[in-house]
UniProtKB/Swiss-Prot annotation:
<dbReference type="InterPro" id="IPR053930">
    <property type="entry name" value="RapZ-like_N"/>
</dbReference>
<dbReference type="GO" id="GO:0005525">
    <property type="term" value="F:GTP binding"/>
</dbReference>
<dbReference type="Pfam" id="PF22740">
    <property type="entry name" value="PapZ_C"/>
</dbReference>
<keyword id="KW-0067">ATP-binding</keyword>
<feature type="binding site">
    <location>
        <begin position="8"/>
        <end position="15"/>
    </location>
    <ligand>
        <name>ATP</name>
    </ligand>
</feature>
<comment type="similarity">
    <text>Belongs to the RapZ-like family.</text>
</comment>
<dbReference type="InterPro" id="IPR027417">
    <property type="entry name" value="P-loop_NTPase"/>
</dbReference>
<dbReference type="InterPro" id="IPR005337">
    <property type="entry name" value="RapZ-like"/>
</dbReference>
<feature type="binding site">
    <location>
        <begin position="57"/>
        <end position="60"/>
    </location>
    <ligand>
        <name>GTP</name>
    </ligand>
</feature>
<dbReference type="GO" id="GO:0005524">
    <property type="term" value="F:ATP binding"/>
</dbReference>
<comment type="function">
    <text>Displays ATPase and GTPase activities.</text>
</comment>
<keyword id="KW-0342">GTP-binding</keyword>
<dbReference type="Pfam" id="PF03668">
    <property type="entry name" value="RapZ-like_N"/>
</dbReference>
<protein>
    <recommendedName>
        <fullName>Nucleotide-binding protein Bphy_0322</fullName>
    </recommendedName>
</protein>
<dbReference type="InterPro" id="IPR053931">
    <property type="entry name" value="RapZ_C"/>
</dbReference>
<keyword id="KW-0547">Nucleotide-binding</keyword>
Length: 297
């Protein structure tokens, strides 16, 4: 059975991801106490079901401490994948304010007994980060701070479609003006390269469009930058594989995340295609984005 565990920070889009998995034919359960997961998987497998998606969050409390070992145990019997959703505290506060929802840890005891109850939303968010931090290393992380719901659904679809063998190498483009992705393992700043934005004909395009590609490919400094990044990754990738990492996210950032970072992320993904499980995504470029869609909530 394939089991997708969705976890992360409340307000980061777990419901959106779970709905996307339900649409893809998964048997979905929200807020399942972790101790019931092995029993549920056994029951559903016996009932002929082969796809299960479960959302687990900080409301599980102390049970989260047992999750790392449970994931290891389940992985010996099933194809287990963990999807960890995250977002900046600022984005989360804005979402809770707009939806008028209460954070699940609001009013719960603080980590320090002398403090009493968690009264502010920011305190509850930070406490939740502490509780679920141990699960982040097991899964593929997605920073939803600037994502629209339809883009998250698309990324979840790609996540379940990819092969789950060895290290998955993710190249992610982004714009520094919207912040560095929280899910990045390596961040490369390419803002020093010539910017197609200042060419009026190239400004409305992206790094996927041929005129922008031709512009950047012709610049020796761009080729040198990509060569340096490629050499660095070629040197250190074996160490990450030996460490049994499931995912490695390489973030490429320019000013707006539309031209230079998109082109370089795509080019590097193509160069590393022979490595096997290579994924590319563009956080801030206007690609496959319906402007009428709401941000993840």
């Amino acid at each position: 059975m394939r089991i997708i565990l969705i976890t992360g920070i409340s307000g980061s889009g777990k419901s959106v991801a779970l709905n996307a998995l339900e649409d893809a034919g998964y048997y979905c359960v929200d807020n399942l106490p972790p101790r019931f997961l092995p029993e549920l998987a056994t029951y559903l497998a016996g009932d002929g079901k082969d796809r299960l998606a479960v959302a687990i969050d900080a409301r599980s409390g102390a049970s989260l401490d047992d999750m790392p070992q449970m994931i290891r145990d389940l992985s010996g019997q099933h194809d287990v994948r963990v999807l960890f959703l995250n977002a900046s505290t600022q984005a989360l506060i804005q979402r809770f304010s707009e939806t008028r929802r209460r954070h699940p840890l609001s009013g719960s005891p603080a980590h320090d007994a002398d403090v009493g109850l968690l009264t502010s939303l920011a305190e509850a968010i930070e406490r939740e980060r502490e509780l679920v931090a141990g699960l982040a290393e097991f899964g593929h992380q997605i920073d939803t701070s600037n994502l629209r719901a339809n883009v998250l659904r698309m990324w979840v679809k790609r996540f379940i479609e990819q092969e789950h063998t060895g290290l998955a190498l993710m190249f992610e483009s982004f714009g520094f003006k919207r912040g560095v992705p929280l899910d990045a393992d390596f961040v490369f700043d390419v803002r020093t390269l010539p910017n197609p934005y200042y060419d009026r004909e190239l400004r409305p395009l992206t790094g996927l469009d041929r005129p922008v590609i031709d512009f950047l490919e012709a610049l020796p400094v761009v080729q040198q930058m990509m060569g340096d990044i490629e050499s660095f990754l070629q040197k250190w990738l074996p160490g990450f594989r030996d460490d049994n990492r499931s995912y490695l996210t390489v973030a490429i950032g320019c000013t707006g995340g539309q031209h230079r970072s998109v082109f370089i992320a795509e080019t590097l993904a193509a160069r590393f295609a022979s490595e096997g499980n290579v994924i590319v995504r563009h956080r801030d470029a206007p690609i496959d984005v319906d402007d009428s869609s709401k941000l993840v909530a």
